A protein has these predicted regions:
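Hydrophobic, well-ordered secondary-structure elements that form the walls
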Residues: 31, 78, 96, 111, ...
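Short loop/turn motifs at secondary-structure junctions and domain boundaries
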Residues: 16-17, 120, 164-167
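Acidic, glycine-enriched loop/beta-strand segments at the rims
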Residues: 49-63, 107-112, 120-154
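Flexible loop/turn segments at secondary-structure boundaries
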Residues: 44-48, 81-84, 119-122, 147-150, ...
Length: 203
């Protein structure tokens, strides 16, 4: 119960960054058994509310210190490997909204650098990660003050009715790939000019 944190029932997930609303803390304040609180919240949300498991203990000050280290690259993930259990595809949005705007872990330019050029360098992606003449760049136009990750939800759109979690974001005014707008005001335009990257460092 000490590591389980409800993500709320609104449009934006509550990650309880202040560490004040674990299942254990909620149960203690309400004078109830943690299981009772858990079931009550599931009933209230009609099963929609998700819970965040703080597997690494929640010592956020230590994590912020690690993330400021020069060799830390925060955005390399396996977003597609566990989509039936959780999704971390919103990690770049969370980093820009939470770690720059609210927590001050990074400045905005530093955050952008770490999730673009620094990530490209680690993966060995050539001529990517920066806006330079002759380089390949995908460009996001963002409304920084309103940039926010959405609440994850489950859909069954895989072959044979397979399911996955997806999460949407707010604050993206447009995304341009290969000179084409593929997203405008959060909606896909139908354009798919991108290609699969096959050349990268393998050792």
């Amino acid at each position: 119960p000490a590591l389980l944190h409800p993500m709320g029932m609104g449009d934006v997930p509550d990650y309880d960054m202040g560490r004040e609303n674990s299942l254990e803390q909620l149960a203690a304040r309400q004078g109830k058994d943690p299981v009772e609180v858990y079931v009550d919240r599931l009933i209230e949300s009609e099963g929609r509310e998700l819970w965040n498991f703080w597997a690494f203990g929640g010592a956020l000050e230590n994590q912020w210190a690690y993330m400021k280290m020069d060799h830390c690259v925060p955005m390399l993930a396996d977003a597609g490997a566990h989509v039936g259990i959780f999704t971390d595809t919103d990690s770049p949005t969370f980093l820009l909204a939470e770690l720059t705007r609210r927590q001050g872990v990074y400045t905005l330019p530093e955050a952008v650098h770490r999730i673009t050029l620094k990530s490209a360098d680690v993966l060995g992606l050539k001529e990517r990660g920066a806006v330079k003449e002759g380089w390949i760049a995908d460009l996001n136009i963002i409304d920084y003050e309103n940039l926010e990750t959405g609440y994850p939800y489950y859909v069954n759109d895989f072959p044979h009715n397979g399911g996955r979690y997806i999460v949407e974001s707010a604050g993206y005014l447009g995304t341009m790939v290969a000179g084409n707008m593929i997203v405008e005001n959060g909606k896909h335009t139908g354009s798919r000019p991108g290609t699969v990257i096959r050349e990268f460092a393998r050792n």
